[in-house]
């Protein structure tokens, strides 16, 4: 923990337990103690001599920020536990893997890149729309896509009151009955691509996230998890902070 004072929710996030937003919720739910006293506001500054507990358990010591790239297979969810007992990507982690959270999410049927980190502040940085990171997806649909279809998808439609901004969409390949598309979005709203294509009666057969900002799926095998080298992670975080307005 750093010597200078910082907001308590930020310190909780840095410990890898959850995001800053979730830390603030825990505080408002009166599940957080500071120096053995329950608190109810996140507007508190703490330093490295303070003791922070969640549900009466002391938070872990802040570790060096790390992140991993995971190729999520279809059929897995991205939360750590599930009332329906569906498989989660956390079951893919080795037993001695550090405590991590996901950056963003993918629905159960979507494959591809999901980023894991032990730092909730990094997760916040990469998730926020203000950061402006592009997400690129490879999508197979049950249709021979026409130029008119592309025009409609690029129109950034409003579906059920939610506006979806499509940065780009291009045809990779197609047959008489199927098309592979590459779609780029920025905000990563819940089920964004599925909602956009469904709005235009285009059925998805496969949806694969290829990249998230500067981080690429590349040749990572399904179910495989690879740590981002420290020097690369440090450089990318520095560049992202330089060109974003997030504080």
What positions do the PLM features span?
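Basic, flexible Lys/Arg- and Gly-enriched helix-loop patches that mediate nucleic-acid binding at interfaces
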Residues: 1-247
């Amino acid at each position: 923990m750093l010597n200078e004072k910082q907001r308590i929710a930020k310190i909780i996030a840095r410990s890898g337990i959850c995001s800053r937003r979730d830390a603030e919720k825990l505080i408002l739910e009166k599940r957080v103690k500071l120096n053995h006293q329950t608190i109810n506001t996140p507007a508190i500054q703490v330093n490295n001599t303070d003791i922070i507990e969640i549900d009466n358990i002391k938070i872990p010591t802040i570790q060096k920020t790390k992140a991993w790239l995971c190729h999520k297979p279809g059929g897995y969810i991205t939360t750590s536990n599930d009332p329906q007992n569906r498989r989660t990507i956390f079951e893919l982690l080795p037993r001695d893997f550090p405590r991590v959270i996901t950056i963003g999410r993918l629905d159960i049927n979507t494959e591809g890149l999901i980023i894991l980190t032990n730092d909730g502040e990094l997760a916040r940085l990469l998730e926020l729309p203000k950061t402006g990171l592009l997400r690129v997806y490879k999508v197979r649909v049950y249709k021979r896509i026409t130029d008119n279809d592309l025009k409609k998808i690029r129109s950034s439609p409003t579906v059920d009151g939610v506006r979806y901004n499509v940065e780009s969409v291009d045809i990779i390949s197609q047959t008489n009955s199927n098309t592979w598309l590459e779609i780029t979005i920025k905000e990563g709203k819940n089920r964004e691509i599925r909602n956009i294509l469904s709005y235009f009666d285009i059925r998805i057969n496969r949806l694969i996230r290829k990249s998230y900002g500067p981080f690429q799926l590349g040749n990572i095998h399904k179910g495989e998890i690879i740590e981002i080298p420290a020097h690369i992670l440090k450089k990318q975080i520095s560049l992202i902070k330089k060109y974003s307005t997030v504080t």
